[in-house]
UniProtKB/Swiss-Prot annotation:
GO CC terms: extracellular region
Disulphide-bridged cysteine pairs: 61-90, 73-103, 77-104, 89-94
Keyword terms, alphabetized: Cleavage on pair of basic residues, Disulfide bond, Secreted, Signal
Organism of provenance: Caenorhabditis elegans
Disruption phenotype: RNAi-mediated knockdown extends lifespan.
Protein name per its UniProtKB record: Insulin-like peptide 7
GO molecular function, one term: hormone activity
Gene for this chain: ins-7
Function: Insulin-like peptide which plays a role in ageing as a consequence of daf-16 activity.
Length: 105
């Protein structure tokens, strides 16, 4: 019998049977951690402004405001004022006139 197989039978098999390792308890622990993480995610409130529009008002955030400015002005915003239209339009409804006054030359 080759020596490597002999080592396998004499050392590794008895050692693996003495090692107190249970896959079932490990799986239970992983599932418990996932449940706790899921419950914590649901209990934490978002600190961002709400991005879901009301029935009548349309809020534009991120890429939507960029596309909206292109649609109204035909090019990127060239604002000379201190008004941050991205924050304003994400919090409240912005009209075409507001965008024209702030961005279009």
């Amino acid at each position: 019998m080759p020596p490597i197989i002999l080592v396998f039978f004499l050392v590794l098999i008895p050692a693996s049977q003495q090692y107190p390792f249970s896959l079932e308890s490990l799986n239970d622990q992983i599932i418990n951690e996932e449940v706790i993480e899921y419950m914590l995610e649901n209990s934490i409130r978002s600190s961002r402004t709400r991005r879901v529009p009301d029935e009548k008002k349309i809020y534009r955030c991120g890429r939507r405001i960029h596309s909206y400015v292109f649609a109204v002005c035909g090019k990127a915003c060239e604002s000379n004022t201190e008004v941050n239209i991205a924050s304003k339009c994400c919090r409240e409804e912005c009209t075409d006139d507001f965008i024209r006054k702030q961005c279009c030359p």
